[in-house]
Regions:
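BZIP DNA-binding basic region
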Residues: 1
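Short terminal alpha-helical segments
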Residues: 5-60
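Intrinsically disordered, low-complexity segments used for protein-protein interactions
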Residues: 8, 12-16, 86, 120-124
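A ubiquitous short alpha-helical element
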Residues: 14, 61-62, 81-86
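Short, low-complexity cationic-aromatic patches
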Residues: 33-47, 82-101
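Generic secondary-structure transition motif, activating predominantly at the C-termini of alpha-helices
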Residues: 34, 77, 81, 104, ...
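Extended intrinsically disordered, low-complexity coil regions enriched in Ser, Thr, Gly, Ala
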Residues: 47-76, 105-120
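Amphipathic alpha-helical binding modules
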Residues: 87-136
Length: 136
């Protein structure tokens, strides 16, 4: 009787580290999202940085690093709801720069597949709750 050779099953839970090139590109994207919100405040710039912070938290980045940025983003959002415009105060700009620098220094700790999954989950959530997208 023949026995089929079984291949070892793929273990998706293995933590694949982020390669330097990927980490550097992501660090640049995070810093540029922060600078974009600071330099040219807009709803789009706010949403880009907000989704990045959400994905990083979902991927397991320390909330101690992310919490100051989340507080600033909440303050910006509250101000937008009060007066209808996105603006970033100088002390908020400083705090956002500090947070993006801390994120930059910590990105190497996040496994690549965990980050990729977190980005997909945040993007899916954003599409589901976005009132501007309509199905025709």
């Amino acid at each position: 009787m023949f026995h089929r050779h079984r291949r070892p099953s793929f273990k998706a839970r293995v933590n694949v580290p982020m390669v330097t090139e990927t980490r550097d590109r992501l660090a640049l994207e995070v810093r540029m999202a922060g600078e974009s919100l600071i330099g040219h405040p807009s709803i789009d710039a706010y949403n880009v940085l907000s989704k990045m912070l959400a994905a990083l938290e979902r991927a397991g980045m320390s909330t101690v690093l992310l919490h100051p940025g989340t507080r600033v983003m909440n303050t910006i959002c509250d101000r937008y709801e009060e007066n209808g415009s996105i603006s970033v105060a100088p002390e908020e700009a400083l705090r956002l720069r500090q947070v993006t620098a801390a994120i930059d220094a910590s990105l190497h700790r996040i496994p690549l597949q965990r980050f990729a999954l977190a980005v997909a989950e945040v993007e899916t959530f954003a599409v589901v709750v976005d009132p501007t997208t309509s199905k025709e």
